[in-house]
Regions:
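N-terminal cap/leader regions of alpha/beta-hydrolase-fold enzymes
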Residues: 1-233
Length: 233
């Protein structure tokens, strides 16, 4: 029901969003009579804000075609390694014809970057992927927009999130022996849970687990949100 309401709202807003876009261009163009108005820039800014609030933002591409490895430009090919109902495991495979560079590429460690799911695209970490590609074999979780996932695929909750992370880790362990895991912001908690459960079962755990900017213990450095939760719960 929530997505139907959202889509209805977005559809109703489309004419206003299109008008706001056209008006912003009109008032920001100094060659038009409207653009000569002393208040034109303020009016254009208002319409531009309305347009940005209402527009539908499409997923950007990673656009990583080459990467510099020890001073050598190496081609990068992005492909889907695993395709799950709610997530794609993407691989950035590097290619080179230089024997020395190829040997170094093969010796590089494997890293799984777990990107945030809630409200973000994995391309948010484009620069992180680009940097890691210099000396790592890089994989990243590319979460699908839940809005386009068929209801027949069922629900997706924290347990499923943890299972996905474990499946991706096991896949890389099967292909390479083991891997490193980096979680950024929101996925730090499910990644910690996934690896902890693997350890409790006696499974091989990743070589390292890096958790960046995540709410592992939200009681530390409390914010207004923490205080609200403590007072109202």
């Amino acid at each position: 029901m929530l997505y139907q309401i959202y889509e209805t709202q977005r559809t109703m807003m489309e004419p206003f969003v299109d008008f706001a876009q056209a008006a912003a261009k009109l008032y920001s163009n100094p060659l038009t009579p409207a653009g000569q108005n002393p208040l034109a820039q303020r009016v254009a800014a208002g319409y531009s804000l309305l347009y940005r609030l209402g527009k539908d933002y499409e997923k950007p591409s990673f656009g990583l075609n080459t990467v510099d490895v020890d001073g050598t430009s190496v081609a990068v090919h992005e492909r889907i390694e695993l395709d799950k109902p709610f997530c794609e495991l993407r691989r950035f495979k590097r290619f080179t014809d230089d024997p020395g560079t190829l040997t170094r590429l093969k010796s590089h460690p494997v890293v799984l970057i777990v990107a945030p799911l809630s409200g973000h695209y994995a391309t948010l970490l484009r620069d992180t992927v680009k940097t890691m590609l210099r000396d790592h074999k890089v994989y990243i979780t590319d979460w699908k927009n839940a809005r386009i996932v068929p209801l027949s695929e069922g629900k997706f909750d924290l347990d499923d999130y943890v299972n996905y992370v474990q499946e991706f880790i096991r896949h890389l362990q099967g292909a390479y022996g083991n891997c490193h895991v980096i979680s950024v912001c929101q996925p730090t908690v499910p990644v910690l849970a996934a690896i902890s459960l693997m350890a409790s079962r006696g499974e091989t755990t990743p070589l390292s687990m890096t958790m960046m900017g995540g709410p592992i213990d939200a009681r530390k450095s409390p914010t207004a949100v923490n205080n609200l939760a403590m007072n109202k719960s």
